[in-house]
């Protein structure tokens, strides 16, 4: 394992001091500065700085990221979706009418993407097609990432893949090892069943692994597989995912190497994770199970928005003290004094997060969820633009939606040095996770569209979503 640059400097300092001791060049004539106490003092100072450099938290940099953009042949318009549903001969007329209403109010446009096997009549989902979808998305995102960064796959020491519903054997992380012929000591992780918030969980895992592995690159792949996830029954609680979820995936390059700071786009400042799974209502609000006829699907509770709001409140309680300015903290203390100490009836305290965040990347889970977050946090239509436009252009791409949203912000040339970005993810369990990044440099126009999935369409956005 390589020695970090800061550690190397401290070790070099100690070696120089030892050499000086041996040469007796630190001799002073005054009794107070006699050689022995001077040597001991300098040695203690060196030990202190060495201990500080080895125990302090090393920065984690986001070198770059890339989102997969499928080919036009995989685009699925509303009309194509309805034709597919009818051609499958699985759904009743009432079910098709219900999905029609959901899709028309979903906020999705006609340029989202579907697996190729779902565009045939009838659809032909299979394990082979599921693997094909994952290979296209994962390798497409990774190839773009390696091209953008100039980093070879074998230089990466840590790979983390998160895909909630598709868990083949060998794993998706092993598929990457095989494709890129990675080194035998590469550390790989495969996260499943973590829902749409798994991308944030992967960032947290990568951050902790980078603390234990200096001078290392970590790559995160966030995706979901649609081929085997389509619900083929008529239970209304399980039909909404059919209408909202689409093909997508992202690859993210993280580094703890000090020399990467200059070229990296962002530095990680905070991760706050909230898990409300101890509550049955939260645990079962988004659950994969069988319907009354034994058909597997993901059932969404009518309480989903309420559960998400409660989880968000808990998450913000932990995040607020880390990011809010002093003025907002004082207002919060005043609210607590009035409501708790004096039992006064006061309006709920809602922090102004626009004071500490420039860009908002809220998980594009659905129109209702985005509306609730916008209203609950007092955000503007402009603040929610990246999320709503991502939902319109790409649909709900699960854990990778946060990166399509950040790609939108970059494509609009809005990222300036020092800006803070808030990525907010929701997922089954129920989980609510926040990631805060600080932009290390301004993203110029000639770089913002390179390998960006918005490159061919950002000029059309924003659009009005009815």
Curated annotation (Swiss-Prot):
Q: Where is the signal peptide?
A: 1-23
Keyword match Nucleotide-binding? no
Name any one GO molecular function. Answer: fatty acid elongase activity
Q: Which GO terms describe its cellular component?
A: membrane
Membrane topology summary: Single-pass membrane protein
Q: Which domain of life is it from?
A: Eukaryota
Q: List keywords of the entry alphabetically.
A: Acyltransferase, Membrane, Signal, Transferase, Transmembrane, Transmembrane helix
**Which cell locations does it reside in?**
Membrane
Statement: the UniProt record of this protein carries the keyword Acyltransferase: yes
Q: In which pathway does it act?
A: Lipid metabolism; fatty acid biosynthesis
Q: Where does this protein have coiled-coil stretches?
A: none
Which SUPFAM superfamilies did the record assign? Thiolase-like
FAE domain residues:
52-341
According to its UniProt record, in which tissues is this protein expressed? Expressed in siliques and flowers.
Gene Ontology biological process terms, A to Z: fatty acid biosynthetic process
Q: What turns on expression? A: Repressed by herbicides such as flufenacet and benfuresate.
Main localization, broad class: membrane
Supply the Pfam families for this chain. Answer: ACP_syn_III_C (PF08541), FAE1_CUT1_RppA (PF08392)
Entry EC no(s): 2.3.1.199
Task: List the active site.
Answer: 196, 275, 359, 363, 392, 396
Q: What does this protein do?
A: Contributes to cuticular wax and suberin biosynthesis. Negatively regulates the stomatal development in elevated CO(2) conditions.
Question: This chain belongs to which protein, by name?
Answer: 3-ketoacyl-CoA synthase 13
Which organism is the protein's source?
Arabidopsis thaliana
């Amino acid at each position: 394992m390589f020695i970090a640059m800061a550690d190397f400097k401290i070790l070099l300092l100690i070696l120089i001091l030892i050499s000086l001791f041996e040469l007796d060049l630190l001799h002073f004539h005054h009794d107070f500065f006699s050689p022995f106490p001077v040597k001991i003092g300098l040695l203690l100072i060196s030990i202190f700085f060495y201990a500080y450099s080895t125990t302090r938290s090393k920065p984690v940099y986001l070198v770059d990221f890339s989102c997969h953009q499928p080919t036009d042949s995989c685009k699925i318009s509303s009309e194509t979706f309805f034709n597919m549903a009818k051609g499958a001969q699985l759904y009743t007329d009432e079910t098709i009418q219900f999905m029609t209403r959901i899709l028309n109010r979903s906020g999705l446009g006609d340029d989202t993407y579907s697996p190729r096997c779902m565009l045939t009549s009838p659809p032909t989902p299979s394990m082979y097609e599921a693997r094909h979808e994952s290979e296209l998305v994962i390798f497409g995102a990774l190839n773009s990432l390696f091209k953008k960064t100039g980093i070879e796959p074998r230089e990466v020491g840590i790979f983390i893949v998160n895909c909630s519903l598709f868990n083949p054997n060998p794993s998706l992380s092993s598929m990457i090892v095989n494709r890129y012929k990675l080194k035998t000591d590469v550390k790989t992780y495969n996260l499943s069943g973590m829902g749409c918030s798994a991308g944030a969980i992967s960032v947290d895992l990568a951050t902790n692994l980078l603390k234990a592995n200096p001078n290392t690159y970590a790559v995160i792949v966030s995706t979901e597989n649609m081929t085997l996830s389509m619900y083929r029954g008529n239970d209304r609680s399980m039909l909404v995912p059919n209408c909202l979820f689409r093909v997508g995936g992202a690859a993210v390059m993280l580094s703890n190497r000090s020399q990467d700071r200059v070229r990296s786009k962002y530095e990680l400042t905070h991760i706050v994770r909230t898990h409300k799974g101890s509550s049955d209502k939260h645990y079962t609000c988004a659950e994969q199970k069988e319907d009354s006829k034994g058909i597997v699907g993901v059932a969404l509770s009518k309480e989903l928005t309420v559960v998400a709001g409660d989880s968000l409140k808990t998450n913000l309680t932990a995040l607020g003290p880390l990011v809010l300015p002093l003025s907002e903290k004082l207002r919060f203390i005043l609210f607590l004094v009035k409501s708790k100490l004096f039992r006064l009836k006061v309006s709920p305290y809602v922090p102004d997060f626009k004071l500490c965040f420039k860009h908002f990347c809220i998980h594009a889970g659905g129109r209702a969820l985005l509306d609730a977050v916008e209203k609950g946090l007092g955000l503007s239509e402009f603040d929610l633009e990246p999320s709503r436009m991502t939902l319109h252009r790409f649909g709900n791409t699960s854990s990778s939606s946060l990166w399509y949203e950040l790609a939108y912000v970059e494509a609009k040339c809005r990222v300036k040095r020092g800006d803070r970005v808030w990525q907010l993810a929701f997922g089954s369990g129920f989980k609510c996770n926040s990631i805060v990044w600080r932009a290390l440099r301004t993203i110029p126009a000639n770089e913002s569209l390179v390998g960006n999935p918005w490159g061919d369409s950002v000029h059309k956005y924003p659009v009005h979503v009815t």
